[in-house]
Amino acid sequence: MTIKVGINGFGRIGRMVFQALCDDGLLGNEIDVVAVVDMNTDARYFAYQMKYDSVHGKFKHSVSTTKSKPSVAKDDTLVVNGHRILCVKAQRNPADLPWGKLGVEYVIESTGLFTVKSAAEGHLRGGARKVVISAPASGGAKTFVMGVNHNNYNPREQHVVSNASCTTNCLAPLVHVLVKEGFGISTGLMTTVHSYTATQKTVDGVSVKDWRGGRAAALNIIPSTTGAAKAVGMVIPSTQGKLTGMAFRVPTADVSVVDLTFIATRDTSIKEIDAALKRASKTYMKNILGYTDEELVSADFISDSRSSIYDSKATLQNNLPNERRFFKIVSWYDNEWGYSHRVVDLVRHMAARDRAAKL
């Protein structure tokens, strides 16, 4: 039986999630995307947005449009690889979306608007069974990072969950390996050098709450905030309060990189850390954590579906005499593509656990 999914918000992440489903051969086989929701319902425009992408290139699948019924004025249905997806008008209150009528079980909440648990619960009142927020969430929604704490999902108690942020999905696997392999973290500082996103300005504009954030994204390196490091403490409790960080938004359209400087809880070496991360990337963190020892730059990671790709050539150790605990490690991530694949993975994981619990 296929998983019935609705995507609320067919913007950057919503479309990338949909494309990930298609590229992985899941659409119509394991997952049935019943509907996508956005401010307009013009399927022809949605089709155009999917066909052509300035970063990830042309859509690799067949896409056309049709009408859901003869009485509608414009095409309101996408047809992708022969599968029909209804385009639904966005609502101020998610409870007003017709999830129950459409048979949708799992909603991917990717508008960026309903990130508080109580607001996202509107989807449940609309007839959905579960909600995955594709952003950091507040108000008591449990946060999951695939490969790190996804097995803590409780089908009977957790109905609205968060897939964390793209940066947390890059950082948490690194920290998970460091903790699991016994290196530990006494304290650490993280910086993400992050590509600009849709919330930024193309030219200098008004940004009353974040003055620097109002400057032209493609012309500046912009210091910013991130909750990614602190969020790691939510998924790896032993690191609670030990990590904090900041961001630099930079003039690239996609791919970001995490720089983690930390003090281990025991003496170790670059060689030992490198070996542990390489081993993890081939075993228990495969397809989540990657490893590279090549001379790569950001463009080389565009459309990489892994959450975090550790750069072994960038690892540093403090050069003070007898210092064996102070290190810097670096990891790349496609902040769009890798993250979108983890959203899909989380939905699949939840559905499998829900079926096992006979929900």
UniProtKB/Swiss-Prot annotation:
It holds the Pfam family Gp_dh_N. It catalyses: D-glyceraldehyde 3-phosphate + phosphate + NAD(+) = (2R)-3-phospho-glyceroyl phosphate + NADH + H(+). It is found in: Glycosome. The keyword Metal-binding does not apply. CDD domains: GAPDH_I_C (cd18126), GAPDH_I_N (cd05214). NAD(+) binds at R12, I13, D38, Q91, N335. Gene3D superfamilies: Dihydrodipicolinate Reductase, domain 2, NAD(P)-binding Rossmann-like Domain. PROSITE patterns: GAPDH. Homotetramer. There are two identical genes that code for glycosomal GAPDH. This is Glyceraldehyde-3-phosphate dehydrogenase, glycosomal. It comes from Trypanosoma brucei brucei.
